[in-house]
Amino acid sequence: MNNWKKLAAAVILAGAVVMIQGCGGNGEEAKSMEKGRVWKAATEAAYPPFRYVDENSNLVGFEVDLLKEIGRRTGATIEFRDMPFDRLLDAVAGKQVDMAIGAITVTKEREKLVAFSDSYYRLSGYSLLVKKGNPPVRNEEELAGKVVAAKRGSTSEARAKAQNPKEIISMDHYEDIFKALEAGKADVGITGDQAALYELEHGGSSRLSLSGTIPTEDNFAIALSKDN
């Protein structure tokens, strides 16, 4: 039984006392086994509101709080390691870290490389953003023939590539998607709905417009080594 998967599922879905299954022991026994342990968690610290660095140089956000709560309930310490998004799964598979969290969508292709916890968040859609005043891009089909800015290695990038765009500009950081739009380097940017909303609510609405959405039911989960 995958201990990490049991752990994540217990916190995320049940909201009950976290239990790590171990040698048939009960939750308290399993918790005592993890007390004092340091778990290395890979993430890309630039995707608000899920995770980002605040004005005090602290890593914060929903996913950060989630892992800290898992650590609190088990007596373990979470040690975050910042790295590019497209390296997260390789870091887990190569056992450089114990887990990765970072709005990682569960896909069949990714399941060949790593295991996943139960989902902790369901994405309702991808947002299509354009520079304020530019023609709207309303849906997935209208990406055809457009220059699209997307996050490197993301499922949103894969969705955009499937629509025969003129060009995909792959960005290492989500904020670079917004900068590319503002600079006129891309016709449209694609990102998760909550990330787009956060940008628009924190000053982006003066420069960018939400012009369309792509419905989806992608699930985010914690990536874990298949050997755990």
Predicted regions and their residues:
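C-terminal motif of bacterial Sec signal peptides marking the signal peptidase cleavage site
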Residues: 18-22
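Bacterial signal peptide processing site
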Residues: 24-26
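Flexible hinge/capping segments at coil-to-helix
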Residues: 30-33, 130-148
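Extracytoplasmic small-molecule ligand-binding "clamshell" domains
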Residues: 31-103
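Short loop->beta-strand "edge-of-pocket" segments that line small-molecule binding or catalytic clefts
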Residues: 39-43, 140-153
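Periplasmic-binding protein-like
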Residues: 45, 122-130, 193, 197-228
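Short helix-initiation/N-cap motifs at beta->coil->alpha
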Residues: 64, 79-92, 135, 155, ...
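A ligand-binding cleft/hinge motif common to bilobed small-molecule-binding domains
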Residues: 90, 104-113, 159-162, 182, ...
